[in-house]
Amino acid sequence: MKKVLITGGSGGIGVGLVRAFCQNGDKVVFTYHKNLEAAKALSAETGATALCADLGDSEQVSLTVRSAAETLGGIDVLVHAAGIACVKLFDMTTDADWDALLRANLSSAFYACREVSKIMLGQHGGRMILIGSMWGKVGASCEVAYSATKAGVRGMTQALAKELGPSGITVNCIEPGVIDTPMNACFDADTKRELAEQTPVGRLGTPEDVAALAIFLASDAASFITGQCVGVDGGFAI
């Protein structure tokens, strides 16, 4: 049984992650920001512990990680799934949009990894799994700011893997494609159908697709895998 902290646990992919790790027999704490009712429901369903936090605030992250470690008795696995999207033409993207994306997608990952690393270094081991995006690899029109933040997550994954590897800590990034979650509710049925047709396997992804890889990367079988950015995109970003 692993002690797992999942950020952004009340969101689409996050819900799938919480369910999967709980079904795997692991002890789970997850964070949420504003969706209290969803967090309560997920906690009741899975038995996982929910903690409210604004992960763009470094002080809140420090307190949250400390609380999670106390609840779990340490942290073996961090899965950082918190984040937001923004679909806009580049010249219409505001400073506020940019700042919000940086805060939610990149700063939050930096803060979470930094605080959890302090615990894992003391334990002489651990697994960090960051949820990026295929757009961090290939870029997306009308999602320039989002793509840039996810490219930052990609770079941080690789740098952290080099620094933390000698201490027994692996760091990997999962890069989902178009996943059928509330984050992509901005797409109408026709757009979703077109995206599915553009995906070689012929469908959109599910949170369960992402969670399956996270479970593997957290397992003992993945101990020699680090610094990797693995696509779960149905072949979209080939």
Where are these regions (language model features)?
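Conserved glycine-rich cofactor-binding loop
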Residues: S10-G12
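Conserved glycine-rich Rossmann-like NAD(P)H-binding loop of the short-chain dehydrogenase/reductase
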Residues: N24-K40
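Substrate-binding pocket helix/loop in short-chain dehydrogenase/reductase
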Residues: L89-F90, T94-L102, N184, T191, ...
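C-terminal substrate-recognition "lid" of short-chain dehydrogenase/reductases
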Residues: F110, G125, R203-V232, A237
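Active-site helix of classical SDR
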Residues: C113, T149, T157
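Alpha-helical segment proximal to the catalytic Tyr-Lys
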Residues: K118, K162-P166, S223
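Residue(s) in the substrate-gating loop at a strand-loop-helix junction
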Residues: S133
